[in-house]
């Protein structure tokens, strides 16, 4: 009984660690999207650089999340589908966005950021559900 509880506690801890990293990524993506809107409205080169910096922050957080999700998935099969998350923007679009700094490039990058944010939000919900089930199993 105590061994099972310990395993559940370890899985819950891994899930919470993954959630924290995913939420950090979501925050960075939200920041990048806000900078993206400013960029679309004529923010300029500095705005593009800040936006891509926030995307880099999101990718670092997602790398941390992948490690935590791998640990979590060793305990729980439900999260295997979210292990390949990334907030990468197509390199050509990133170059085009910074070098040309026009509204068309800004819109392409904004769409990629929104898609990445949607995937991260789905992963957060998947992990939250799994953690809630584990917490329920622990109480049972």
Model regions and ranges:
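A composition-biased, non-transmembrane "mature-region" signal
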Residues: 1-140
């Amino acid at each position: 009984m105590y061994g099972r509880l310990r395993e559940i506690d370890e899985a819950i801890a891994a899930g919470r660690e993954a959630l924290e990293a995913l939420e950090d990524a979501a925050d960075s993506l939200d920041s990048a999207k806000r900078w993206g809107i400013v960029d679309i409205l004529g923010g300029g080169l500095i705005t593009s650089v800040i936006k891509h910096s926030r995307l880099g922050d999101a990718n670092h957080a997602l790398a941390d999340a992948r490690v935590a999700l791998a640990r979590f998935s060793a305990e729980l099969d439900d999260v295997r589908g979210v292990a390949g998350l990334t907030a990468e923007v197509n390199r050509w679009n990133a170059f085009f966005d910074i070098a040309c700094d026009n509204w068309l490039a800004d819109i392409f990058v904004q769409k990629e950021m929104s898609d990445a944010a949607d995937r991260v939000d789905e992963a957060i919900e998947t992990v939250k559900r799994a953690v809630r089930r584990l917490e329920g199993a622990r109480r049972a």
